[in-house]
Amino acid sequence: MPKWIRSTLNHIIPRRPFICSFNSFLLLKNVSHAKLSFSMSSRGFRSNNFIQAQLKHPSILSKEDLDLLSDSDDWEEPDCIQLETEKQEKKIITDIHKEDPVDKKPMRDKNVMNFINKDSPLSWNDMFKPSIIQPPQLISENSFDQSSQKKSRSTGFKNPLRPALKKESSFDELQNNSISQERSLEMINENEKKKMQFGEKIAVLTQRPSFTELQNDQDDSNLNPHNGVKVKIPICLSKEQESIIKLAENGHNIFYTGSAGTGKSILLREMIKVLKGIYGRENVAVTASTGLAACNIGGITIHSFAGIGLGKGDADKLYKKVRRSRKHLRRWENIGALVVDEISMLDAELLDKLDFIARKIRKNHQPFGGIQLIFCGDFFQLPPVSKDPNRPTKFAFESKAWKEGVKMTIMLQKVFRQRGDVKFIDMLNRMRLGNIDDETEREFKKLSRPLPDDEIIPAELYSTRMEVERANNSRLSKLPGQVHIFNAIDGGALEDEELKERLLQNFLAPKELHLKVGAQVMMVKNLDATLVNGSLGKVIEFMDPETYFCYEALTNDPSMPPEKLETWAENPSKLKAAMEREQSDGEESAVASRKSSVKEGFAKSDIGEPVSPLDSSVFDFMKRVKTDDEVVLENIKRKEQLMQTIHQNSAGKRRLPLVRFKASDMSTRMVLVEPEDWAIEDENEKPLVSRVQLPLMLAWSLSIHKSQGQTLPKVKVDLRRVFEKGQAYVALSRAVSREGLQVLNFDRTRIKAHQKVIDFYLTLSSAESAYKQLEADEQVKKRKLDYAPGPKYKAKSKSKSNSPAPISATTQSNNGIAAMLQRHSRKRFQLKKESNSNQVHSLVSDEPRGQDTEDHILE
């Protein structure tokens, strides 16, 4: 079956006109019962066998349609999410028909735009031009809020009013004709796409070991195995993981932990989905103690969420700082749940400060102001960084807030990461507890052999920043091409130079940054929702902002006429004016002015370098269009020439790195990285120290601290300068297997575990026992509700002496003994019969306190 038809099946067909062969049109119409119209046209067509079809009414295929199509030998059912509710169907249809009140064109609604592949070189308006055949794109899972979907997913819409379809006798004939004709018209050939010029290799440090690199010969479509169809890989939680999910659904504050590879991060992602379904997407704060860990779960650092900066100062000072920020104040007021990953690196003092802030802002004396808490991490891994070497480390579980608020502490026991390598699991568990025997030491020393040289570059982990910098600089020197040096601009009101230099070291942005084309880099600042501290990417080119402005406009609309580029190339002032209009949109003047001054100051900090031509790989997005039209080919060539001219006009200007970043979901994003500013402020928000620099650092090698929470298929670890408890365990447990692990300078005397952590872990319970306790508590609660007092309600006394139950309201009005019975319900009573009084009923207690007790009935 033609790929175009396959990609259309069991999805909404676009309302705009589309081009297909006549046979494909008949096949689609017969199978889908879609109300289609068509017109014969020769413009842009090679023969009259091709028609322009248009959907009169949006249509969705049912399961019966899919069953019919699956009879074909060539049919491959796409493994992708289906719409399930009529409400969603109506919403999508509404979005398709929605028109902009100004230009009367369909609005670029988020759900509608999901029909268009984000990496497509065509614009929205060009997707359905008569001269272009562009198949409708699949709907990705992220197109819809999963919280609004049913838990039991079907394979498609079921319409009970429409009978199952009968197979047409000409089905095979139509199918074969469609294959031959559709292939001749495919605009994008998946097998012949231009390779992305993205350097040789990149070790992507993500939580998903199946996608571990970006290669020069691998485009985005190859990241999914089914020819462009995004495959939904189902997450199957273990029984203990499901038990923890149920505890969270019941509103409990939870801390769960486990050894490396027990699926803590996977469970956390599923729990976040559940919590967002309960509280709403905007009311669940997803955070982590480090930027890289936050990147893995799609969140931000706890410091960034809370609005406390570095968290220095007493709790009241930080509270006042949060109060001054409307954004952070609103966050604290509205959230229903707070998720913190890698809680082990958060110290007790900071956790108590956050608890104080939450209670004060929310005016609620419950722990964290009544916010549901979900903590995850492993205290056997890296401890909090001690600010004062003379003060002992205090873990988060030692804080007052933890003891008051976190009642469910659970240990995960099933290992997934090193599953199948029982020996490796045992070695890691011994290292975790600091209990290394002779055999374990021998096994780790065997791993000093070099790793096989294949396509995947091993990530290198070191214990100190100096070692990381040395390794990264060595890798950079091996790359060909010119080195671009970016010097930071430091400032601030602090006069003590020694203290100032020490504070500047807290910034992740380096004082001097060396980059080349092909360098692997990491973002060190949160810029937006998808580009955060910890995002990894590769430098593919250097260009000035003016050139990038033209380049971005061309990538957004490859069909842009060359005349527009000619105007900008011949008249740079018009280009600058267009840039200023673009940058000022949506920004307050003060903010825009500050950003402009930062960039200008950084640009003046270096002399312009000689301009080298843009690499041809930058224009690969235009070469993906397969066409024999000489006019189109000439336009593409002309646009490349104009871009080179605009680039050459940038002589004397600072050129910035153009980086292709890789997200945790394997999508890519091209960004011209511009300078950012960092500052440490006093109580009046006056900068004590500040730095302006590109928010990048080289990332072939990482410190062990930054690697916590990562899964690395190939990793090289040097333990020569390990200095912290848990540091060696974190580094070695990043590996998936011994085959992908190289260990240098292993020393068993450096493998230690903290005694406080060992004692704390002895108090943890299993997920199964915690859930059983929850069920028992619910039964007790239900029993209490069943026996709760009320009008005309007969309750059994809880007193073991069979004391009377609370008396009904009618009796209370006639008998003054009711108040006394309620005050002393747990004491023994003996009441004598009284004449001329209303009848009073009392039930016999089912919990006798002694054998000599008697049942008493009030009458």
From Swiss-Prot:
Residues 142-178, 782-859 are annotated as: Disordered. Keywords: ATP-binding, DNA damage, DNA recombination, DNA repair, DNA-binding, Helicase, Hydrolase, Isomerase, Membrane, Mitochondrion, Mitochondrion inner membrane, Nucleotide-binding, Nucleus, Phosphoprotein, Transit peptide. ATP binds at G258, S259, A260, G261, T262, G263, K264, S265. Its cofactor is Mg(2+); Mn(2+). Induction: Cell cycle-regulated. The nuclear isoform is present in very low amounts in G1 phase cells, but increases as cells progress through S phase, with a peak in late S/G2. The mitochondrial isoform follows a similar, but less pronounced induction pattern. The nuclear isoform is prone to APC/C-dependent degradation in G1, whereas the mitochondrial isoform is not. Its EC number is 5.6.2.3. Residues 142-157 have a biased composition (Polar residues). Phosphorylated. Undergoes RAD53-dependent phosphorylation in response to loss of mtDNA. SUPFAM superfamilies: P-loop containing nucleoside triphosphate hydrolases. Residues 727-746 bind DNA. GO terms for biological process: chromosome organization; DNA recombination; DNA replication; double-strand break repair via break-induced replication; mitochondrial genome maintenance; negative regulation of telomere maintenance via telomerase; replication fork reversal; telomere maintenance. GO terms for cellular component: mitochondrial inner membrane; mitochondrial membrane; mitochondrion; nuclear replication fork; nucleolus; replication fork; site of double-strand break. It comes from the Eukaryota. Mg(2+). To a lesser extent, can also use Mn(2+). It catalyses: Couples ATP hydrolysis with the unwinding of duplex DNA at the replication fork by translocating in the 5'-3' direction. This creates two antiparallel DNA single strands (ssDNA). The leading ssDNA polymer is the template for DNA polymerase III holoenzyme which synthesizes a continuous strand; ATP + H2O = ADP + phosphate + H(+). Residues 800-809 have a biased composition (Low complexity). Pfam families: PIF1, Pif1_2B_dom. CDD domains: DEXSc_Pif1_like, SF1_C_RecD. Present with 259 molecules/cell in log phase SD medium. DNA-dependent ATPase and 5'-3' DNA helicase required for the maintenance of both mitochondrial and nuclear genome stability. Efficiently unwinds G-quadruplex (G4) DNA structures and forked RNA-DNA hybrids. Appears to move along DNA in single nucleotide or base pair steps, powered by hydrolysis of 1 molecule of ATP. Processes at an unwinding rate of about 75 bp/s. Resolves G4 structures, preventing replication pausing and double-strand breaks (DSBs) at G4 motifs. Involved in the maintenance of telomeric DNA. PANTHER family: ATP-DEPENDENT DNA HELICASE (PTHR47642:SF5). This is ATP-dependent DNA helicase PIF1.
